[in-house]
UniProtKB/Swiss-Prot annotation:
This is Shikimate dehydrogenase (NADP(+)). Shikimate binds at S22, R23, S24, T69, N94, D109, Y228. The lineage of its organism: Bacteria, Pseudomonadati, Pseudomonadota, Alphaproteobacteria, Hyphomicrobiales. The gene is aroE. The active site is at K73 (proton acceptor). Belongs to the shikimate dehydrogenase family.
Length: 289
């Protein structure tokens, strides 16, 4: 039996609350059509108080697995009977699948972050030092990716220093916590600068200048933002003006979807320019560029 036959009729999902904003159905729908797989992928809105029962009834509802987004990632972590290494390190699950009747959880955000940089800025992981702006939940996946790829020194800057200290304590050696007032000084020797904050994101002061001067960064430094709405954030615009190589956050969204699709439908999809343009067209239609 070939992979297409095995995947026939398989169902997967993305769940969050709310979930109508998600572009995951567009991504997976594109791949299902491209690969000729007779499967489905749908958005399912689940309230926080209903998540545990939803996760427990995946098989009964005919699902092979699915993606989990805000606010359910920690609840999915707790619900999973088995966790992959990335999920354990990050403390959150964004991908669920069934294996011999057991609910398994993984986290593909770190993979997506690194794969996006591999595609758009090959050699990025030769940087000895990385600067991560922000210490929220998303920064954990970024830090895990950096450590996994051998970055020697990761500085995490956050307005509330205690949040950065918690993150540094979680990951241990090679991760260092700093207050926001130290960010400017840290730029000068950072080979990779990652923005995980909402500064410049739609509804968070878009159009405003990013409050850090990037002209003192090494000329070979790479700047990347995990935000993809808007596609060109204030941070990326400032980095581009400073002459740095920039990588937007859309690729992370696309690449993080790959491992889950392969688990549910049995074929590994490709992140192509055609897929990117498909999502960009939807973003333009929604006024999200």
């Amino acid at each position: 039996m070939d992979d297409k036959s095995m995947a026939r009729g398989r169902k997967a999902f993305v769940t969050g609350f709310p979930i109508r904003h998600s572009r995951s159905p567009l991504i997976h729908g594109f791949w299902l059509k491209e690969l000729g797989i007779d499967g489905s992928y749908e958005a399912v809105e689940v309230k926080p108080e209903d998540f545990s029962s939803f996760a427990a009834s995946l098989a009964a509802n005919g699902f092979a697995g699915g993606n989990v987004t805000i606010p359910h990632k920690e609840a999915a972590y707790a619900a999973a009977e088995s966790l992959d290494e990335a999920a354990r390190a990050i403390g959150a699950v964004n991908t669920l699948w069934l294996e011999n009747g057991r609910l398994c959880g993984g986290n593909t955000d770190a993979y997506g972050f690194a794969a996006n940089l591999d595609a758009s800025a090959p050699g990025w992981d030769k940087a000895d030092r990385a600067l991560v702006l922000g210490a929220g939940g998303a920064s954990r996946a970024v830090v895990h990716a950096l450590l996994s790829r051998g970055v020697c020194h990761v500085s995490v800057v956050n307005r509330t220093l205690s949040r950065a200290e918690e993150l540094a304590a979680h990951f241990g050696a090679r991760v260092y916590a700093h207050g926001w007032d130290e960010a400017q000084a840290l730029v000068s020797n950072a080979g990779l600068i990652v923005n995980t904050t909402a500064l410049g994101m739609s509804g968070h002061g878009e159009g405003q200048d990013f409050p850090i001067d990037l002209t003192c960064a090494p000329k070979e430094a790479v700047a990347t933002d995990i935000v993809y709405v808007p596609l060109r954030t204030a941070f990326l615009n400032k980095a581009e003006k400073a002459g740095l190589k920039t990588v937007d956050g859309l690729g992370m969204l696309l690449h993080q979807a790959v491992p889950g699709f392969e688990r549910w439908f049995g074929q590994r999809p490709q992140v192509t320019q055609a897929l990117r343009e498909h999502i960009l067209a939807d973003m333009a239609k929604a006024g999200a560029l």
